């Protein structure tokens, strides 16, 4: 009997369970906090540009090409901290599924009184039978190309997209995903509010 193999397997399972419990507790706190979250005018354009700048070194280190087309002065009524988390989860989901030398494209635009953000990544398409479940809690397609590290500050055992939907729903928005020819596109929409400075 190769005891080292079994010890390693047990350690991996215990580590996975520990992270799942931590993620569940984290989500429970998030759900409670969102019920009384403070709302204000959020410049979504600046928020996304900030997050892209924050993760620029990580994308460069992994030789991932990042294309961005961010329309200026896209405002929504919401909680910036939670909206940042939703966008962050989309970006990290794309990062984890994109191989070196491939591309991630982020767009933000105003569309029919909505703000629409899209995050596309080159890579494996999601199987059709999995598509309807990716928003479920603790569901994962098991197609990730990279482990999650402290560098990106995200634990992902299958709650990332579930949290995105929860946050977007709280902001009276919508979100979804679709397979493209060479990858996957995730999107979210929020009601637009006018730039009061104009």
Describe these PLM feature segments:
Residues 101-113:
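Short beta-strand/loop element within the Bergerat-fold HATPase_c
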Residues 12-17:
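Short alpha-helical segment of the dimerization/phosphotransfer core of two-component systems
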Residues 160, 164:
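Short alpha-helical Gxxx[C/S/T] motif in the catalytic ATP-binding
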Residues 38-41, 60, 65-75:
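Conserved catalytic submotifs in the C-terminal HATPase_c
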Residues 126-139, 146-149:
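Short conserved segment of the HATPase_c
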Residues 94-95:
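Short helix-loop "hinge" at the ATP-lid/N-box region of the Bergerat-fold HATPase_c
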